[in-house]
Swiss-Prot record:
One Pfam family recorded for the sequence: Peptidase_A8
Function: This protein specifically catalyzes the removal of signal peptides from prolipoproteins.
Protein name per UniProt: Lipoprotein signal peptidase
Protein source organism: Shewanella baltica (strain OS195)
EC class name: hydrolase
């Protein structure tokens, strides 16, 4: 018998929804309150600075001419769909993997909406030291990175993956 949404990883989909809305609300706040490249200094090493990212993480392919928007759209839809299918097939008890997948889904969909609505992703979290700035990012990027770390942790660092357990994945 297939897992129901209550018994499957889909039970954790609320995390993706929370990430998505937190990301979108924060970006709407930035768009409503900042001009492009405007900064608000919050700490000696931390600003909110509105920048536009036409590429992927660390502005990868940002000056590629526009085609990358559609590539990243396809990748976001593909990964979100694949991870949702995996959530449906695994037990709700697999906390680490369910959390990881839903963080990635929420982040991917948050950045996807930006790409489709604006043609770029709104970034604003700006850490720096002296004059060296880490590339600006957003809540969606953070969720994707945390989710990826959790997936790697599960796959490589924990010795035995949560999915190795007999009750972990419904085949």
């Amino acid at each position: 018998m297939p897992l129901t949404w209550k018994d499957s990883g889909l039970r954790w989909y609320w995390v993706a929804v929370l990430v998505f809305f937190a990301d979108q609300l924060s970006k709407q706040w930035v768009l409503a309150n900042f001009d492009l490249h405007e900064s608000l200094n919050l700490l000696p090493f931390f600003n909110f600075t509105y920048v536009r990212n036409y590429g992927a993480a660390f502005s990868f392919l940002s000056d590629a001419g526009g085609w990358q928007r559609w590539l990243f759209t396809i990748v976001a839809v593909g990964f979100s769909t694949l991870l949702t299918v995996w959530l449906r097939k695994q037990s709700a008890s697999l906390l680490k993997l369910n959390l990881a997948y839903t963080l990635v889904i929420g982040g991917a969909l948050g950045n996807l909406v930006d790409r489709l609505m604006h043609g770029f992703v709104v970034d604003f979290i700006d850490f720096f030291w002296a004059k060296s700035h880490y590339p600006a990012f957003n809540i969606a990027d953070s969720a994707i990175c945390i989710g990826a770390v959790l997936i790697i942790w599960d796959a490589f660092l924990s010795g035995k993956s949560e999915t190795d357990s007999a009750e972990g994945v419904k085949k």
